[in-house]
Amino acid sequence: MIGIYAHHHGSGHVQRALSVAAALDDEVTILTSARVRDDAVPDPGRVRVVSLPLDVGGSGDGAGPDPTAGGRLHWVPLRHDGLRRRMAVLAEWIDRHAPTVFWSDISVEVTVGARLTGTPVVSTVLPGRRDDAPHLLAHGVCSALVAGWPRAAGAPVPAGATRPLVPVGGVSRFAGRDPGAGPRPGERHGERPRVLHLRGSGGGGHDRRWDAVRDELGEVDWISLGGPGGRWVADPWDELCRADVVISAAGQSSIADLAAADAHVVVAPEERPFGEQDATAATLARLGLAEVVGRDDPVDQLVGAVRRTLEVARSSSGAGSGLRETWEVDGAAERLAGVLEAVAEGRENGVERRGPEFAGRERGREASGRRPVERPAEPTVGAAR
């Protein structure tokens, strides 16, 4: 049995957990406070979902003293019923099922709590500067640390860690799909350019600058998906592939999904703790994979970024952006599954020696038929610096 914790904020953590669960051979249980549709669970006889109580709201919601235990943890509000029940469910599940490894995606408190049961823990490391005391603690207790970005983005040793970081590539729910199956940008002669504006569920209000960009461009078909009060579709794959340009925030799952579609992208990073999305956007810009706009940029700069990206997309004669290859989406879920299996079997040192291709997971980059782009690795996405 392999245990997986998926954070409830946004949809990306659950999507990543489901993708990796599908790539594993063992029984898997995903523990989360998020709502997971029954039809989203791969192989329900092997993969199960356990609902965790929320640790926010209700009594002891953080208004009381010391919700961070003196800065040593991120969120442990005193006398909070939900937190107590949450950690009790986690400990009881571990005691009952004795998982061979537990993957935390991602919570310092869950990481430490699982490790305190004597269970080997693997944790996801997110981009940004993560050298505060809670991250130092969490990084140090893990048997392995994984990152959902490519090797070209860098693999620094996270602050507090005793083991190297393993970048597995962008884990996307769309990794098995072919973005070239339908008409690609530049192949639809006579049609108006198509711009897709994605607004996710991870937070952030409506940025009215994009309304002005839409009005300024005028000559394009502008489609908006997601966001508070917006139109949602369960599967945006066709829209991703039909768009000449996609405008998106810089969340890890968002970028992985865009990479799977080999989309031409304008990235507008949202403000997140530890500079997470800013770090990802900076790496995309450094690798020449996206136009990046800032939160304070005027409308004319946003218009210019979209127009430049449209020009590249429309002149590409149907070729993708190259994001899929460079972001190493193909086989990423299998590579992360390989890390979990290696730790479960006590082969942590093999993970360190062999890097992303390990544990019998030779499908992946090789099986996809794609060769990774060789670029110097720099610690730009960086875990903690």
Which functions belong to the PLM regions below?
Residues 7-8, 26-83:
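Conserved nucleotide-sugar phosphate-binding/catalytic loop shared by glycosyltransferases and other
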Residues 102-105, 236-279:
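A donor-sugar binding/catalytic signature common to diverse glycosyltransferases
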Residues 21-22, 180-245, 255, 295-297:
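Donor-nucleotide binding loops and adjacent catalytic segments primarily
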Residues 303-385:
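C-terminal amphipathic helix plus adjacent low-complexity
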Residues 67-101, 106-111:
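Conserved nucleotide-sugar donor-binding subdomain of glycosyltransferases
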Residues 4-18:
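A short, glycine/small-residue-rich beta-strand->loop->alpha-helix junction that serves as a flexible
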Residues 139-204:
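A nucleotide-sugar donor-handling region in carbohydrate enzymes
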Residues 123, 135-147, 239-240:
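A conserved, positively charged/aromatic
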